[in-house]
């Protein structure tokens, strides 16, 4: 056999698919999974279209344009890999590409598929769950027609062919119709016959001829009738001769039956079978009754041992209530632990706050005013106090600065006053200078030198100030940075520099004073410089005195600002002191707001502490009440040494134990009751079977079992004789009553004599009939001559022509009836030969599908409906099967049809959710059958939307379609 396997599909445009490629696995069973509207039916139609051409009715042409069609790639053992490309524009185009690069036309597909078209493929290889769900409604004729025509011509061929033949037959003839062709031709023939009779009546002498002819025809009919009667007598005599031995045997058997005793016929028809059946039921039931009595005694012992604690069971509701409320008890414990932790934390925070506030009594804080108005007044008072304190600090700094500046100004005035020359010294210098000017007026170069020396000294003094200032700056910087060694080094360097520069100044001063004694030019210049410096010092003194007056005025203004501050800020200090007294705060007033905030927090913690203490007491009370309720349910010796959870667990365990005891007791009581009912039922059945056996003995007129068997033997002999007599009577009933009466009233020799007489009479009648037929033939010739002379001949011709037309139309109608009869004969042959073979193959599939529960499929002999036989011998009609089993039956028949009708070609199966109603076991078995069916390379494509069906296959076998 050759098997075609689809490798892949490439869809150009087909239905909802556009430019899609689907690759099939090498597994013979391939699953195409997708939800509703995912394209499963579209893919099935695409495969059929690629193999057999596009459908003419239900088309899948693209709505948005594009190439309608695609490519199907398949593998064939003989042709190798084939690519079937089919597209449709104005006309359908088909190309078949081989793996050798050859391009073939559609004839290769017809050869490959061996004449299988789309309808035959859908009838054999493609089916779904709705195909034959009502299979139980089909009888032998219906399913035979369906399977035959679906296998030969397609599923719809039977109805179309039958309808077409019926229409053509009714177009030609209907028994009571007017319009059909044969009905009209017969009506025309009838009218011509009437006209012919009228014309014949007008012919003279014609009627006499006809009368003579009718007389001969009547004699001929009478002779033929007598001949038939004679033949009947002969047949009756022959039948009597055949039945004469049977009558003799019947008489002998009746005599033998009459010799049997009268009670032999009273024995029940199936007495031995009934006795065996009753005894076969009686013995096991007696054994069952004895076993039940032993079981009854054992159950009664077990019941007496089981004594449940009724008092504890009465408390089951309370224990269940406490068990249900145990989570509340645990919750109370957890809440209590959390509250105690919070209480410890709150107490610690309260103690820390009191310690920080330097207080010991926490109740003082409860009376503290924490209103918003009080807090606002406190904030205002503290804010004013802080502002006053900051203002005083600023005034202190200003006062200190003004005082320092005043002292500096006084020192500067004193320094400037000390730098001015006394009047005597100034006068001496002025006199010396005037004398020098008078005597030394020509020493200009010396004067220039003195000016340069003076300039150098000024530059040296500026440099000295710069170095000292920089040194002091570095000393202060290193002191701030706490780097004492660099600071000390810079200090020592400054001291050395100052000493060296001082000696240089002293040396210069001495050099300057030396010319004064000599009244040198340099000395004279120094005198002028000294007088000029004295004038400048006087001017500087005036400036310092003016600055001193300004500093004194600023000092007075600071003192006035102190007095104004004392007048304005006194109420703020008073208000702050009041708040400090009210709050018991003795520290710096600037920290009063922080202390107040801390007091509020501590007050909240104190309140929280009191609330937590109250809540802890409430929870302890709830837990104590719950513990007391649980303790009341426990025995006295256990109530003190067990936790609540263990106590509840023990109570629940005890309840469960007692309930289990009570349950076991009830079950045993139920078993006892059921056992009593069984014993009563068995006793009644045993009594019934004993009564039936007694009735059976009474019916046979037997005293005991031995007598019953003796009578049974006599009855069996009588039955055999009666059966022989019945067989003889059945053979005699096959003949006519006249034959039996004739055989009974005559001997065998008398019957043979009568047979000889009737045979001679038959020969005489045969000769007479031949003579009459010759005479009638001569009269018919004369009649034809008369009819040929006038109108009668024309009408006769028309009548004969019309008869020919009627014959032609009747032949057409008869040929249609013959075709219908041929089809019926073909169906009958298919039902008798092919259909049993098909059902045998279907049974081979049906057995593994049902796990061997059903063995055989056949048709009922009464109504030709489908019957199946269970493995226990029970026979079921199709309508008595479950839906799943009925679908298994349908699946087996479809598989058998494919196997028996596929010829030499194996095309892929397409199953559309055919097993949706199967459970897991049925699905597993049908998958095994599918794999067995796929042996030899047959490909099976299973389309489904169900998850559990998909999960039964390997992932490599599944193609997913997206909705």
Curated annotation (Swiss-Prot):
The chain crosses the membrane at residues 468-488. GO terms for cellular component: plasma membrane. SUPFAM superfamilies: P-loop containing nucleoside triphosphate hydrolases. PANTHER family: DOUBLE-STRAND BREAK REPAIR RAD50 ATPASE, PUTATIVE-RELATED. This is Uncharacterized protein YhaN. Its main location: membrane. Keywords: Cell membrane, Coiled coil, Membrane, Transmembrane, Transmembrane helix. Residues 176-236, 373-467, 536-570, 647-789 form a coiled coil. It is found in: Cell membrane.
